[in-house]
Amino acid sequence: MIWLTLVFASLLSVAGQLCQKQATCFATVNKRRKHIVLWLGLALACLGLAMVLWLLVLQNVPVGIAYPMLSLNFVWVTLAAVKLWHEPVSLRHWCGVAFIIGGIVILGSTV
């Protein structure tokens, strides 16, 4: 159950980052303020809930084991940026993502 909590904390943290990015995207002049407030409000809600879940994780898992798992955030954000905003990602970046996944597998397999 605690590992599921860690996954949700990671996904909520990613959602918060994506909401911040969306807040910076274009909105018409008459809707700009509402657009920014909406997306930044959602970002704060996601990041706040992620923090609460993270604290629950830290009560049950050594930080040296739990923290590296948050590296998945880099993977999720990269995938979302490509899908949502069609951001270009270099081969070097994809190699880095692969190394991150490999590192998580290595660190997670010691549990």
Swiss-Prot record:
Matching SUPFAM superfamilies: Multidrug resistance efflux transporter EmrE
Q: Which GO terms describe its biological process?
A: lipid A biosynthetic process; lipopolysaccharide biosynthetic process
Quote the subcellular location field of this record.
Answer: Cell inner membrane
Membrane spanning stretches: 36-56, 61-81, 88-108
Instruction: Topology check: give the Periplasmic ranges.
Output: 57-60, 109-111
- Example GO molecular function term? carbohydrate derivative transmembrane transporter activity
- By its UniProt entry, which InterPro entries does this protein fall under? EamA_dom, Flippase_ArnE, Small_drug/metabolite_transptr
Residues assigned to the Cytoplasmic compartment are 1-35, 82-87
Regarding the membrane, this protein is recorded as: Multi-pass membrane protein
Residues annotated as domain EamA: 40-109
Q: Which domain of life, per UniProt? A: Bacteria
- Sorted UniProt keywords: Cell inner membrane, Cell membrane, Lipid A biosynthesis, Lipid biosynthesis, Lipid metabolism, Lipopolysaccharide biosynthesis, Membrane, Transmembrane, Transmembrane helix, Transport
Task: Please name the pathway.
Answer: Bacterial outer membrane biogenesis; lipopolysaccharide biosynthesis
Cysteines engaged in disulfide bonds, as pairs: none
Q: Does the keyword Glycoprotein apply?
A: no
Description of how the protein assembles with itself and partners: Heterodimer of ArnE and ArnF.
The UniProt similarity line reads:
Belongs to the ArnE family.
The UniProt entry, under HAMAP family, shows: Flippase_ArnE
Q: Which PANTHER family match?
A: 4-AMINO-4-DEOXY-L-ARABINOSE-PHOSPHOUNDECAPRENOL FLIPPASE SUBUNIT ARNE-RELATED, SMR FAMILY PROTON-DEPENDENT DRUG EFFLUX TRANSPORTER SUGE
Cited function: Translocates 4-amino-4-deoxy-L-arabinose-phosphoundecaprenol (alpha-L-Ara4N-phosphoundecaprenol) from the cytoplasmic to the periplasmic side of the inner membrane.
Name it.
Probable 4-amino-4-deoxy-L-arabinose-phosphoundecaprenol flippase subunit ArnE
* Originating organism: Escherichia coli O127:H6 (strain E2348/69 / EPEC)
